[in-house]
Amino acid sequence: MKTVVFAYHDMGCLGIEALLAAGYEISAIFTHTDNPAEKAFYGSVARLAAERGIPVYAPDNVNHPLWVERIAQLSPEVIFSFYYRHLICDEILQLAPAGAFNLHGSLLPKYRGRAPLNWVLVNGETETGVTLHRMVKRADAGAIVAQLRVAIAPDDIAITLHHKLCHAARQLLEQTLPAIKHGNILEIAQRENEATCFGHRTPDDSFLEWHKPASVLHNMVRAVADPWPGAFSYVGNQKFTVWSSRVHPHASKAQPGSVISVAPLLIACGDGALEIVTGQAGDGITMQGSQLAQMLGLVQGSRLNSQPACTARRRTRVLILGVNGFIGNHLTERLLREDHYEVYGLDIGSDAISRFLNHPHFHFVEGDISIHSEWIEYHVKKCDVVLPLVAIATPIEYTRNPLRVFELDFEENLRIIRYCVKYRKRIIFPSTSEVYGMCSDKYFDEDHSNLIVGPVNKPRWIYSVSKQLLDRVIWAYGEKEGLQFTLFRPFNWMGPRLDNLNAARIGSSRAITQLILNLVEGSPIKLIDGGKQKRCFTDIRDGIEALYRIIENAGNRCDGEIINIGNPENEASIEELGEMLLASFEKHPLRHHFPPFAGFRVVESSSYYGKGYQDVEHRKPSIRNARRCLDWEPKIDMQETIDETLDFFLRTVDLTDKPS
């Protein structure tokens, strides 16, 4: 049976050996180049492939159309993935008639995502396992073909558990691969209500927070012990690594992080005490705890800390242009919730951000980006991250004021982009789902979908092409001049503070705001061309969490990426949106203050938007880049978003002159 294999690490090697032992014909193997910053304690898939005479490749992006075509030419009957680190696109998965199967290091649906080996130890689990499952578009979500349980002993650390999982994986594959070969497998769907998902871990995630219980810190030490980077702490500015530890039920009134004794080296925790059995100062050698205490100059009563004592982290300065807008004000709230951001904002109004004006880490200037160019250039130079969120983004304006859309959305933003290039600042640019235009793909993909717009005499597309050209300019600056950038494409974000009812009164608002105004005023809900156009609606909280993770940029994974941010599960037509909104309105406690529902009315787009308008029938995002770069999934159901958005707007209405 012909197969193409995607593999890395020890699991990749044993998976390849198991396939060969089971009589599979491996046409090609795809793997990764080794990261020089990573301690390579595991087997080399590339070396194994070379020794076995199998073609092996390590492309940066295996999902590129050229690689998809090359894999198609191999005509695989089945595809296997053994610890390959990138998501494989649906186009590749569909190439194998017998399907694609992935080996995952947990008992799915628990511990989907990255680093399950480490996470089960961090969380103090007593059991894990390996799962072979069918691959689908969503990571680790396909039907289970086989599982094998593995007990986690109290003295297991990451490497011993890794060896146990490898042994279990060999057994699992020996039992299961012949059945797959003969088409004789029983698949069990995963229970979504039991699913848990965990993200990528970095060495910086393993600092010891002494206010936590000793058992929790001991589990952290176990989870990242050698050959992983190790759990760490600081004495003053001196970093040290803890390689092994023991939990002591020591009752002490000492502050967490205090040294209780140096022989043994015992540290007070939020609950109990942690004995540091072995450790290492800086880049030195491993030594026992009491010697480490001597090396670090510790005495009874000394204090350890999770961060260097004199290097308080400078807050990251974020410049948000259009800070009073829908995305800007919600993003400001999310950033200020953390203690390491300083937000600088500019906008022509401040009603949505009034709640932040007295915050010590929020700095606001009221002004227009077309006028305050010197202020903007100064703050681009001063800040670390720039988000130019100013744009005209309401469809009626595309036909009503196309030149103003071009001047603001393109020309003003191009100037800001050039400032970022000049001062070498990171830019996070709001592209738009509109750039996909009339694309016919089932899922709009950032890296593969064509961007299709209408003729020049349809000014409705001026917003789309302005944004698209800026995307291309930013990409070119990144390629040619090293601009650090991320492009994000929101798909129909909704929530409180989206537009306002006054904007809806002049037709310059998004769909849901216009529909709410119709309900508030007792006017018919207008369904443009019947309202059959489908969109994927995304809760603002989900969207902002993804955007926050782009700003955080863990491991620089977002650099040079284009990321759709939308909820493909929340697809509905505008008509269905209106019906859901109406149902929510009818049961709202303030309903009796408003006129009776005036019904739905179908209108032609030309009579509503004017000459030059074209609509898009569907717009559904692929979110594989968001999953890969951000470890992000949208979580909030559309009905909840509708209820909260409606409630917000109804409570802004002056009810003194409304019927009761």
From Swiss-Prot:
Coiled coil: none annotated. One of its GO terms (molecular function) is UDP-4-amino-4-deoxy-L-arabinose formyltransferase activity. Residues 1-304 are annotated as: Formyltransferase ArnAFT. One of its GO terms (cellular component) is membrane. Its EC number is 2.1.2.13, 1.1.1.305. The record marks 102 as: Transition state stabilizer. Homohexamer, formed by a dimer of trimers. CDD domains: Arna_FMT_C, Arna_like_SDR_e, FMT_core_ArnA_N. The record marks 140 as: Raises pKa of active site His. Residues 314-660 are annotated as: Dehydrogenase ArnADH. SUPFAM superfamilies: FMT C-terminal domain-like, Formyltransferase, NAD(P)-binding Rossmann-fold domains. The active site is at residues 104, 434, 619. In the N-terminal section; belongs to the Fmt family. UDP-L-Ara4N formyltransferase subfamily. In the C-terminal section; belongs to the NAD(P)-dependent epimerase/dehydratase family. UDP-glucuronic acid decarboxylase subfamily. The keyword Kinase does not apply. InterPro entries: Arna-like_SDR_e, Bifun_polymyxin_resist_ArnA, Epimerase_deHydtase, Formyl_trans_C, Formyl_transf_N, Formyl_transf_N_sf, Formyl_transferase-like_C_sf, Lipid_A_modif_metabolic_enz. Pfam families: Epimerase, Formyl_trans_C, Formyl_trans_N. This is Bifunctional polymyxin resistance protein ArnA. NCBIfam families: PRK06988.1, PRK08125.1, PRK11908.1. The gene is arnA. (6R)-10-formyltetrahydrofolate binds at residues 86-88, 114, 136-140. It catalyses: UDP-alpha-D-glucuronate + NAD(+) = UDP-beta-L-threo-pentopyranos-4-ulose + CO2 + NADH; UDP-4-amino-4-deoxy-beta-L-arabinose + (6R)-10-formyltetrahydrofolate = UDP-4-deoxy-4-formamido-beta-L-arabinose + (6S)-5,6,7,8-tetrahydrofolate + H(+). The keyword rRNA processing does not apply.
